[in-house]
């Protein structure tokens, strides 16, 4: 049965839409967009007071399957994604076995098709086993559906190995996503190196440990002509390096997370809250402000979550022994609405670019547009819905949110993936 969505405020900068129109969905496609639509026999849904936008895509998510299903699996991770308003996620390859060959890529895709609540786009490892010693089977992975290459979780430590990966892999036209961490310099760093790490007697994670590899990777991208994407950028100087690389004509993009925009090392002070232990670490107030400005001015290309679920008992360990990472799929949209859109610092149109259009562009995916003939991957949100993070639990298997207890304004209410509703009135279908 066709579905007519009426009275939503539709925002899609790619087709210059920003106003109240109706959207008719028939099967997996948008059949018609216009004012005062009438469709005989269609189910009618009134979306007054809500926004409808192209489906959001999170291009940095850890679904943990295969191998770490005790933390998260594809079913629970995509359920969390749908709850947060996402129609698609890019899955990182640090699984067990590592996604470094076509067989694992096929498993992720088939499992997502079987149990997923949104689309799953697998990324493939640059190197075998994420060890940085030998190139992975890039061609085989692309043939089976990999959309990008990354050793996320570690990063490629050897400059020569990264160059070889880029020189060879660029023929496939995929982006290389770089986790920038100089392991020798960072050592066993736990939180940002500075006053807070000194007060808490925790080993510091220097900003230079990230910035050195950002600079290196930009130079290697320039040398090879490969497409480079800097993951979870967290420092002001790192952002300047990306800005300079873009100005020099290097094919470089970058992403930022809500936790690096809206939390700082000061939130850790005297708390030892392991949910705030992330990689790269929460930085200074100045760094967070620079990242926010980069998101607004266009230097940052995409907002991602780096959704990293862990079991409660892992995060309950001593700070030095607890794993890095926090969950974010269910809070990302709401945080951006609360902190940037509802405060007037950023438009809904810019948010759509950061969370829907640019992620698809960087990953080489087909764009979704609110126009007739486009695939009906759509996100609907209520900008005035107020809720408290964690109050009603999580769809994710994990609970390690750094924003637990925070009251947010704005939340996804409905999600459509290929015309099929996966979130209805805030409930998973």
Predicted features along the sequence, with ranges:
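Metal-associated gating/positioning segment near the N- to mid-region
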Residues: 48-112
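N-terminal metal-binding scaffold of metallo-dependent hydrolase/deaminase domains
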Residues: 1-39
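Divalent metal-coordination and catalytic microenvironments
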Residues: 8, 23, 28, 49, ...
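Histidine/acidic residue-rich metal-binding segments in metalloenzymes
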Residues: 135-303
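His/Asp/Glu-enriched, well-ordered alpha-helical/loop segment
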Residues: 199-227, 294-297, 301-303, 308-383
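Active-site metal-binding motif and surrounding structural segment of the metallo-beta-lactamase
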Residues: 36-53
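Alpha-helix-loop-beta-strand connector modules within alpha/beta enzyme cores
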Residues: 102-119, 167-178, 335
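C-terminal cap of metal-dependent C-N hydrolases
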Residues: 318-321, 375-427
């Amino acid at each position: 049965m066709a579905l007519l969505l009426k009275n939503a405020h539709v925002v899609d900068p790619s087709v210059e839409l920003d106003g109240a129109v109706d959207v008719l969905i028939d099967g997996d496609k948008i059949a018609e967009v216009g004012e005062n639509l009438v469709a005989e026999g269609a189910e009618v849904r009134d979306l007054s007071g809500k926004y409808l936008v192209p489906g959001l895509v999170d291009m940095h998510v850890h679904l943990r399957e295969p191998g770490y299903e005790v933390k998260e699996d594809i079913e629970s991770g995509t359920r969390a994604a749908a709850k947060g308003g996402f129609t698609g996620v890019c899955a990182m390859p640090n699984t067990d076995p590592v996604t470094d060959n076509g067989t694992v890529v096929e498993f992720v895709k088939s499992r997502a098709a079987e149990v997923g609540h949104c689309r799953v786009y697998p990324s493939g490892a640059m190197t075998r086993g994420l060890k940085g010693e030998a190139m992975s089977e890039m061609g085989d992975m692309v043939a089976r559906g990999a959309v990008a290459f990354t050793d996320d979780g570690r990063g490629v430590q050897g400059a020569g190995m990264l160059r070889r990966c880029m020189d060879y892999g660029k023929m496939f036209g995929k982006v290389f996503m770089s986790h920038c961490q100089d392991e020798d310099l960072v050592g066993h760093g736990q939180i940002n190196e500075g006053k807070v790490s000194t007060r808490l007697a925790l080993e510091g994670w220097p900003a230079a440990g990230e910035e050195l590899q950002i600079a290196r990777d930009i130079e290697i991208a320039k040398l090879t002509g490969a497409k480079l994407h800097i993951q979870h950028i967290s420092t002001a100087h790192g952002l300047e390096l990306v800005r300079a690389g873009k100005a020099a004509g290097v094919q470089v993009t970058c992403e930022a997370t809500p936790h690096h925009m809206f939390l700082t090392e000061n939130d850790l002070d005297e708390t030892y809250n392991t949910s705030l232990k992330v990689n790269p670490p929460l930085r200074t107030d100045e760094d967070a402000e620079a990242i926010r400005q980069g998101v607004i001015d266009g230097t940052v290309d995409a907002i991602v979550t780096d959704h990293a679920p862990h079991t409660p008992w892992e995060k309950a360990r001593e700070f030095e022994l607890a794993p890095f990472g926090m969950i974010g799929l269910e809070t990302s949209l709401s945080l951006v609405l609360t902190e940037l859109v509802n405060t007037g610092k950023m438009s809904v149109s810019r948010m759509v670019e950061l969370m829907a259009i640019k992620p698809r562009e960087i990953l080489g995916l087909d764009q979704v547009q609110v126009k007739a003939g486009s695939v009906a991957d759509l996100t609907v949100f209520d900008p005035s819905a107020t809720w408290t993070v964690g109050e009603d639990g999580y769809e994710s298997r994990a609970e390690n949110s750094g924003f637990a207890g925070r009251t947010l304004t704005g939340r996804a209410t409905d999600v459509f993936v290929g015309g099929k509703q996966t979130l209805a009135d805030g409930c998973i279908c």
